[in-house]
Amino acid sequence: LKVRHVLAALAVSALTAQLVTLGGAAPASAADAKAPVNVGLIYSKTGLLASYGAQYAEGFAVGLDYATNHTGAAGGRKINVTERDDAGDPAKAVAAAKELVGQGYKIIAGSTASGVALQIAPVAKENNVLFVSGAAAADAITGNNRNTFRSGRQTYQDVLTAGTIVGSNLRGKKVVVYAQESAFGQANVNAVRTVLGGAGATVDPVTAPLSANDFAPFSQKIKDAKPDLLFPAWAGATAPAMWKGLDDSGVFASTKVVSGLDQRSSYETMGSAATKISFLSHYFYLAPKNKANDALVAALKKQGKVPDLFHPDGFVAAQMIVHAVEKADGEDVGKMIAALEGWSFDAPKGKQTIRAADHAMLQPMFVAKLEGSGSNVTPKLLRTIPLQAVSPPVRPFK
């Protein structure tokens, strides 16, 4: 009898073991069963564009949660994010990218500064990794190589939006581009010459070093030029001083000023200049009405924040990476590239499309004005410009 009991117990034990082997007992989730995906996020945690970098990183975290349906996994693979600070320095960014690539990372994202993005792009090509540039706006990022994508807008889209503000009657008009001596600044000069110069305007630049903090000489030079239109293209912490210099010199009383709407902290610091400018806008959270933007607003509200200028760039980068990993079922770079080319999706700004021919991020833009005074200055949407109207020309891959 004891023998029969022992045999029966052994049989049950064997059957249980067989079922565990065949059925897997499934104590682990699908994400545990597949290798995780490592993403390197290289952006400006410090430096001139640190506030933009913070927005990008926060947007990426919210976008990753949104795109993975709160699981942090894509296609059953956990997404691990490693952050590196480039401080806006291309050399630091390239070193960080090479370090991560050397550790086996197949996906790099970030780049707050255009000069940084333009140096990481060739690293991505040489090492065959996926690179999704962030807030960096230089046109040369588009069409750089098939490994390089962007999650934000590009300068040409800014200038095309500005063109909808100034109209088509530019023949014989004088336009001055006021920009920093940087890749971003030069990209704006080039784009204005192409778009507004192509419409008949004469375009001249006035540029200031990135290190400048006294803008009176540049403001006076602009006033003396007597332009019909001034297009300031500025980024970073010195913007308030730049605007004050223009206002103090009386430029707003003598010329029409069109510029990009900067981050929210700039509204109050622009002083009396705020309501004197016509703004093209990449993004402000009151403009779009859609599910993705609602999710971004709600997630940041829980943190006591509201979305700012570059939160969507991080959000979209996460959407792109999740989509690429899901469609590739892993980190096959060729498959991830193919998955992103031509992809249309709903982003915080609205419907966006990655153009297959050069990886331009086609997206709507906005025209706005600032209302109020002091700490109560807020943007008001005047109109949304559909993506078809602000699509940049194709830049074939190198």
Q: How should each PLM-predicted stretch be described?
A:
Residues 86, 132-133, 139, 210-211, ...:
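Venus flytrap/periplasmic-binding-protein-like
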Residues 41, 100-112, 132-134, 174-179, ...:
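Periplasmic-binding protein-like
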Residues 31-32, 36, 51-56, 66, ...:
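Beta-alpha junction/loop-to-helix N-cap segments that form part of ligand/metal-binding clefts
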Residues 1-38, 398:
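Short, low-complexity disordered leader/linker segments with a strong preference
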Residues 33, 37, 348-398:
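Solvent-exposed, acidic/polar segments of extracytosolic/periplasmic ligand-binding ectodomains
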Residues 95, 115, 138-140, 147-249, ...:
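Extracellular/periplasmic Venus flytrap/periplasmic-binding protein
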Residues 245-315, 326-329, 380-398:
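Extracellular/periplasmic periplasmic-binding protein-like sensory domains
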Residues 33-61, 84-91, 112-115, 178-186, ...:
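Extracytoplasmic "Venus flytrap"
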